[in-house]
Amino acid sequence: MIVERRMYDTERILLELESLPDWDLQICLQSYEGNRDHTFGCGLLKKILDSGRREEDLVHKLFNIPYVNSIIDEYKLYRTKFFLMRPKTCYSYHRDQTKRLHIPIVTNDKCFFVINDKVVRTPEEGRPYVLD
């Protein structure tokens, strides 16, 4: 895991989040050309692959959120999503096939990743964490 030095303004991100359509646990900020469905990139990668597309095809920004879109551009991201983790919940233990960027927006000292069987805390809001 790489912990980036720069920090992002979580207040600005939260303000832009308010402009998005209603969503529950995740919303995709990018899709493939011609698709405006903000749920298409959510869930399992298999859904994307079964449609004949690749994860890397999801580069077209769906929303006018300039600050977040500038982060997408800076890192050349695709299939970017916001996730909402409810209290006392967690992701299933898994390994992504591609590099991931995580920027906690609201977090606490109990949040962590498990990387190579080691607990890594992610207490800093706005701090980017690159997982490969």
Identify the function of each model-found stretch:
Residues 67-87:
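A short glycine-rich, His/Asp/Glu-containing loop-to-beta-strand
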Residues 84, 95-111:
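Short, conserved beta-strand element in jelly-roll/cupin
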Residues 104-125:
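A short beta-strand-loop-beta hairpin characteristic of the jelly-roll/cupin
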Residues 1-72:
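Non-heme Fe(II)/2-oxoglutarate
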Residues 89-92:
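Short helix-to-loop capping/linker segments positioned immediately adjacent to catalytic or ligand/cofactor-binding
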